[in-house]
């Protein structure tokens, strides 16, 4: 998600949540080396330590917007990077100069030079870069771009029309056959297939019924055969009984024959005896004997015969009756068993039909169950897929909503930042107008100094070195060296060093440091001398001398003997007898005899009272000091702020103000520290310090022991008599350049 685009704004070209820039920008190769930045919103890389300070798109509203304000489109760090003319990178040209190698020393320099091709210099050169000209240039270029877009769209439409005409004329023709006359035949065949299918099913059902009937008859036949075998066994048993009876009958007949033969023999013998007895008694002999009458044997035998015949007939009748009764019973049993068997067979056939129907119904239910289970599984899979798609859409929409919310928050925060910057710029412009109206006479006495990739005018005793400042003599301090730095003489302190900073002599404190530091060397802080207070360097803190406060580290503020201010991203501690103020993202601790105060992202405090600014709060000096700033102020300045000194001093300045013991002004982007008892100091991007007066220059600033002011980009030195106007000059030049950069 990119918070800003490079098509229609003054910010640098963007990348994904990081710094912008690159070799494609119109600012040239040196600009491309300064404007690369990381995703986290940090400074972009480059040859000239452009990642320090607020370089390379580090200041973006959403934490990583590509090449935001004070970032990649202006070059690298707050020192050397701005000497390459990288400000000219906006939209491939634009106005060069300001913050990019075009601005000269003091109020006399014009904007122009290096890679930007801005407007020429002269007196009042700061005001010649009119924003209306820039807007007209941008509007004209936008109009040309829109005309080109319209022309390309018209040509694209014409080409599409030509392509469609070509395809309509030469495109392949597709011939479709008319197959409607086959539809009736296909329908008839489908009907026949359906009829044959129905018939086939009916035939299969009949075959199944016939098979079942055949099975029933087979079972019935088996049962009849078993019954027949049982009846045959009974008949065989009865035949044995009949044979026994026949044998008994034959035995009785034989016995009867034997008895008849015996009877005949007895009858014959009796007759013979009777004849013999009658033959012997031919004479009449009457003998009367009184005897019992004799038994008639014939009658007895006849009686016996009749009796036996009756017995035989009776036995025969009994046997016949018993046989008939038994046969009747057996026939009745056979009839009953046949009926029962028939009824049982019917029941069995019915049960078999029922079982078959139940089996068919069971198979149907099983088939239906399997089909329903399959349909249920398909439905589950389909709805699971739909649910997964819906969940993915929900997650995508939630991610988009989160991105929209984050972008809305970024835009809201950016809007609030731009609104506050707009308000502050309007106030600063009004202040600059008042200052310029009062200091118009100082422009006429400005000297000439040369800065790499640009030209301008400066004041007295300023000589330009390569890419930056010059060197000064004793009792006035100087600046110079490569890319902005230099060394100063004794009794006045110097400013410079690589990319902005330098070291001063005794009795005057030190100022400068790489990329905008207050005092000390690069990426650290040094300590100031006695009775003058020191200012902190970039990315680290510095410590003040005896009877003076300490100043915090990175991005920020300086301190003096009247009260110390904490820098951003680290915080500092105040010195004795004056109290200290906490820096942003860390807070600070106050010294003895002074209170502590916490602001948003760090607040500051003093021994007498103060007011908190937005995003960090600031601290006011004791006995009447005024302070207040936005975006981190310790007293005054935004993004780091400094603290005001004792006995009435005021401090201010953008992005890191300075402090003084008697009244000083903070510079932008690092600020400087003022001297003792009256001097004012403060420069943009690293202001200078003085022990008795003087003002720090922009981009590194200089210092003087009794007067003098630091020039831009490392700046020159001023004489004692020019201290006040030089201070105004530096402040005005600094703030006007800051105004151009923010715009």
Swiss-Prot record:
Residues 131-166 are annotated as: Coil 1A. Expressed in footpad epidermis and testis (at protein level). Residues 167-185 are annotated as: Linker 1. GO terms for molecular function: structural molecule activity. Residues 278-300 are annotated as: Linker 12. GO terms for biological process: intermediate filament organization; skin development; spermatogenesis. SUPFAM superfamilies: Intermediate filament protein, coiled coil region (SSF64593). Residues 301-439 are annotated as: Coil 2. Residues 1-46, 440-468, 501-743 are annotated as: Disordered. GO terms for cellular component: intermediate filament. Pfam families: Filament. Residues 131-443 form the IF rod domain. Residues 1-130 are annotated as: Head. PROSITE patterns: IF_ROD_2. Residues 186-277 are annotated as: Coil 1B. Keywords: Coiled coil, Intermediate filament, Keratin, Phosphoprotein. Residues 1-16, 29-39 have a biased composition (Low complexity). Residues 440-709 are annotated as: Tail. Residues 17-28, 449-468, 501-717 have a biased composition (Gly residues). InterPro entries: IF_rod_dom, Keratin_I. The modification Phosphoserine is found at residues 14, 16, 55, 155. May serve an important special function either in the mature palmar and plantar skin tissue or in the morphogenetic program of the formation of these tissues. Plays a role in keratin filament assembly. Plays an essential role in the correct development of sperm. Belongs to the intermediate filament family. There are two types of cytoskeletal and microfibrillar keratin, I (acidic) and II (neutral to basic) (40-55 and 56-70 kDa, respectively). Heterotetramer of two type I and two type II keratins. This is Keratin, type I cytoskeletal 9. The gene is Krt9.
């Amino acid at each position: 998600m990119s918070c800003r685009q490079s098509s229609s704004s003054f910010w640098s070209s963007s990348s994904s949540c990081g710094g912008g820039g690159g070799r494609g920008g119109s600012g040239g190769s040196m600009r491309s080396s300064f404007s690369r930045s990381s995703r986290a919103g940090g400074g972009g890389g480059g040859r000239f330590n452009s990642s320090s300070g607020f370089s390379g798109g580090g200041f973006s509203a959403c934490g990583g917007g590509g090449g935001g304000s004070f970032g990649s489109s202006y070059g690298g760090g707050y020192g050397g990077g701005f000497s390459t003319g990288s400000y000219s990178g906006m939209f491939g040209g634009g106005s060069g100069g300001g913050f990019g190698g075009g601005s000269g020393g003091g109020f006399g320099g014009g904007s122009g030079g290096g890679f930007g091709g801005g407007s020429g210099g002269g007196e009042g050169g700061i005001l010649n870069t009119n924003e209306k000209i820039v807007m007209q240039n941008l509007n004209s270029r936008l109009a040309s771009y829109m005309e080109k877009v319209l022309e390309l769209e018209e040509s694209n439409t014409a080409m599409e029309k030509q392509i469609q005409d070509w395809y309509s004329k030469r495109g392949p023709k597709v011939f479709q056959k008319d197959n409607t006359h086959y539809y009736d035949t296909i329908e008839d065949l489908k009907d026949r297939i359906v009829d044959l299918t129905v018939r086939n099913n009916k035939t299969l059902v009949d075959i199944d019924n016939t098979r079942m009937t055949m099975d029933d008859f087979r079972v019935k036949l088996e049962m009849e055969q078993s019954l027949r075998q049982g009846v045959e066994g009974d008949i065989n048993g009865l035949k044995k009984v009949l044979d026994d009876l026949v044998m008994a009958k034959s035995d009785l007949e034989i016995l009867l024959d034997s008895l008849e033969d015996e009877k005949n023999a007895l009858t014959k013998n009796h007759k013979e005896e009777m004849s013999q007895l009658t033959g012997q008694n031919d004479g009449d002999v009457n003998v009367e004997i009184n005897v019992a009458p004799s038994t008639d044997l014939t009658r007895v035998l006849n009686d016996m015969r009749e009796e036996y015949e009756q017995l035989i007939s009776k036995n025969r009748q009994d046997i016949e009756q018993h046989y008939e009764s038994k046969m009747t019973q057996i026939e009745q049993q056979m009839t009953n068993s046949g009926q029962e068997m028939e009824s049982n067979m019917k029941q069995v056939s019915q049960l078999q039909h029922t079982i078959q129907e139940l089996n068919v119904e069971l198979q149907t239910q099983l088939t239906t169950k399997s089909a329903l289970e399959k349909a249920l599984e398909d439905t589950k899979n389909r709805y699971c897929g739909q649910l997964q798609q819906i969940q993915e859409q929900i997650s995508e929409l939630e991610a988009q909503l989160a991105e929209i919310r984050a972008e809305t928050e970024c835009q809201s925060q950016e809007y609030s930042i731009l609104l506050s910057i707009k308000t502050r710029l309007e106030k600063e412009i009004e202040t600059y107008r008042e200052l310029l109206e009062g200091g118009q006479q100082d422009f006429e006495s400005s000297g000439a100094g040369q800065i790499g990739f640009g030209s301008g005018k400066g004041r007295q005793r300023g000589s330009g070195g390569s890419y930056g400042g010059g060197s000064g003599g004793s009792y006035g301090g100087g600046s110079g060296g490569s890319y902005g730095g230099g060394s100063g003489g004794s009794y006045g302190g110097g400013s410079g060093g690589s990319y902005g900073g330098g070291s001063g002599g005794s009795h005057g404190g030190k100022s400068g440091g790489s990329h905008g530091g207050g005092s000390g060397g690069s990426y650290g802080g040094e300590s100031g001398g006695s009775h003058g207070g020191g200012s902190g360097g970039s990315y680290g803190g510095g410590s003040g001398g005896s009877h003076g406060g300490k100043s915090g580290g990175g991005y920020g503020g300086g301190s003096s003997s009247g009260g110390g201010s904490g820098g951003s991203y680290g915080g500092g501690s105040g010195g004795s007898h004056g109290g200290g103020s906490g820096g942003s993202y860390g807070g600070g601790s106050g010294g003895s005899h002074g209170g502590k105060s916490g602001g948003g992202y760090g607040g500051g405090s003093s021994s007498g009272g103060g007011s908190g600014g937005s995003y960090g709060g600031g601290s006011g000096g004791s006995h009447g000091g005024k302070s207040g700033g936005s975006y981190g102020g310790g007293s005054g300045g935004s993004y780091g702020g400094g603290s005001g000194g004792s006995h009435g001093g005021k401090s201010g300045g953008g992005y890191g103000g300075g402090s003084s013991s008697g009244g000083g002004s903070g510079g932008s982007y690092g600020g400087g520290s003022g001297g003792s008892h009256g001097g004012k100091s403060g420069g943009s991007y690293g202001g200078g310090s003085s022990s008795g007066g003087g003002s720090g220059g922009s981009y590194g600033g200089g210092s003087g022991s009794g007067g003098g002011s630091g020039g831009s980009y490392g700046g020159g030195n001023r004489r004692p008599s020019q201290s006040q106007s030089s201070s105004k000059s530096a402040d005005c030049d600094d703030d006007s350049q800051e105004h151009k950069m923010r715009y």
